[in-house]
Amino acid sequence: MEKKNAVIVEAKIYKVFDLWKRKPKCLTFNDTDVIIVTAEAKGGEKIRETFFTCLKADGTFSLKTPNQIAESRRQKLAKFLTYYKFTDSPEDYNLVNNISKWKNKEVKIVRDKGENYIFI
């Protein structure tokens, strides 16, 4: 897979019910927050990556959860944070306070099955 460079132009945290009237069936009870990262490649092509998690009151999240599907979603977020060097300790990283620092950070994108994704 060929990796291309892109730059994060927007990163926001939403509550699930800010985006949907009913929680999508694929989400578990403890998937309460959504992080949407928008990156732009050369030529203006925009790529969106979505991360589901459950933020604690202090803005951090836990990798451990009773549900394996929710845990794998959180692992994806943790890999993103460590791969792009936002933090070495994802569970101690305050997403609420630090998400604004993601803007203009360079990321890699890959094309798979006709879709572009942020490489993690």
Task: Label each residue range with its predicted role.
Residues 1-120:
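Short beta-rich binding modules
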